[in-house]
């Protein structure tokens, strides 16, 4: 189902002008936070305009909103007055932490166990916190600009360096067991009461980053590598059996830090709003090749006759972009949440364009055909058209050699800001 958007009514008037000004201010603030190259002194964003060409929207699915949209923001003062919170989750969390058996077990000094004890490895006891819903546990962070820096909405932390079917969104759509937050000690965990990598105290962040293979984009932290590994008793020399056990005990003691006494206390889960029957979410395939405009000025430093001798303003005008992606619009009470999906998540939820076209033609997809890949290729922003103005030109080229570098830097920052602030799990929230 296709939707015709009245682009002029949505982007004009006082509300449209106010929204354009907030977008301009947001992009300007982002440029003030990034590290500029040596040959650029400053970047100023002067204006933003939505243009006159509307996007082409095709509704793919209407479903329930993502659970991330129900997380309560601590800075939102109006939510406490106008909305009801799910009271059972937070009180149940505190009640479980304050129960005497759980508190005494976490606080007392437990004796070290023999790492080679067969009965210990075959134990079926599980963590007291296993009954908690895994989606209440915070996700691992990843380096970069977090999604919560936007002044236009309420953003979430970015995914923990995972992509493709390893992301929680794609894992839910593909049926992969990503959200199983707790591991049975009999199935490979090292001690009772310590969760797997998705738990809040499972592993130190520096160890988590070390476990990620950056050379493989589909890799994710291994659960086995986050817990102490012990060599089998048969591999130890007979004379060093005692030494091997002592070494295993020390290694186990290093990872069995008591969360009640260590410097990393258990973090409370985010408060969740109550789901209502009238909440809904729309997935749209958005295509845009319009004339959105963005005006910037970058000051170029000249190093002749001395370093940073003078600065020349370079005016850059973004005259249009080409976009192809999947948009998410969720309506929850008096809030509208808006974001885009990454290519991997879009493929997992609604499939690719090639799969849809071949499904309509009843033609099977062959993996031997490299030109018919079912994956979405490239980023969401396919093209950014830009014009620069500075000094005179010779044969259609700029006289200053750094103009091209400035253009590439500015466009890279625009693309990076869009992908980090507009792609799920980051999203914008509008109060209506």
Swiss-Prot record:
Provenance organism: Aspergillus oryzae (strain ATCC 42149 / RIB 40)
InterPro entries reported for this sequence: Mdm12, MMM1_dom, SMP_LBD
GO biological process: mitochondrial genome maintenance; mitochondrion-endoplasmic reticulum membrane tethering; phospholipid transport; protein insertion into mitochondrial outer membrane
Basic and acidic residues bias spans: 243-253, 355-364
Superkingdom of the source species: Eukaryota
Gene it is expressed from: mdm12
Protein name: Mitochondrial distribution and morphology protein 12
Gene Ontology cellular component terms for the protein in this record: endoplasmic reticulum membrane; ERMES complex
HAMAP family assigned: Mdm12
């Amino acid at each position: 189902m296709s939707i015709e958007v009245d682009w002029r009514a949505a982007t004009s008037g006082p509300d449209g002008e106010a929204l354009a000004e907030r977008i301009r201010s947001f992009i300007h603030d982002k440029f003030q936070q990034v590290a500029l190259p040596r040959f650029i002194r400053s970047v100023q964003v002067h204006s933003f305009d939505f243009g006159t060409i509307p996007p082409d929207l095709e509704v793919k699915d209407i479903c329930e909103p993502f659970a991330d949209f129900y997380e309560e923001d601590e800075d939102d003062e109006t939510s406490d007055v106008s909305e009801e919170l799910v009271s059972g989750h937070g009180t149940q969390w505190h009640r479980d932490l304050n129960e005497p058996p759980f508190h005494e077990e976490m606080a007392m000094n437990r004796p070290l166990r023999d790492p080679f004890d067969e009965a210990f490895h075959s134990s079926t006891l599980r963590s007291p916190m296993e009954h908690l819903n895994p989606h209440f546990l915070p996700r691992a962070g990843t380096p970069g600009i977090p999604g919560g820096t936007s002044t236009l909405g309420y953003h979430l932390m970015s995914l923990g360096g995972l992509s493709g079917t390893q992301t929680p969104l794609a894992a839910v759509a593909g049926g992969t067991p990503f959200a199983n937050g707790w591991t049975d000690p009999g199935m490979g965990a090292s001690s009772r009461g310590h969760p797997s990598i998705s738990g809040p105290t499972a592993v130190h962040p520096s160890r988590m980053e070390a476990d990620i293979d950056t050379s493989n984009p589909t890799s994710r932290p291994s659960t086995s590598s986050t817990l102490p590994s012990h060599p089998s008793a048969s591999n130890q020399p007979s004379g060093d059996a005692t030494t091997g056990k002592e070494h295993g005990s020390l290694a186990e003691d290093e990872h069995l830090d008591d969360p009640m006494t260590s410097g990393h206390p258990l973090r409370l889960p985010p408060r969740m709003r109550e789901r209502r029957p009238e909440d809904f979410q729309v997935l749209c395939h958005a295509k845009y090749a319009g004339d959105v405009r963005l005006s910037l000025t970058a000051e170029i430093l000249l190093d002749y006759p001395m370093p940073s001798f003078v600065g020349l303003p370079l005016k850059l005008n973004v005259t249009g972009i080409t976009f192809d992606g999947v948009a998410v619009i969720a309506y929850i009470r008096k809030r509208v949440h808006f974001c885009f999906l990454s290519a991997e998540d879009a493929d997992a939820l609604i499939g690719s364009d090639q799969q849809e076209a071949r499904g309509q033609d009843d033609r099977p997809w062959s993996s031997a055909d490299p030109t018919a890949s079912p994956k979405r290729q490239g980023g969401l922003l396919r093209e950014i058209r830009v014009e620069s103005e500075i000094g005179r030109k010779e044969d259609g080229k700029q006289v200053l050699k750094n103009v091209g570098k400035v253009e590439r830097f500015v466009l890279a920052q625009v693309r990076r800001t869009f992908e980090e602030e507009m792609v799920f799990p980051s999203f914008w929230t509008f109060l209506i």
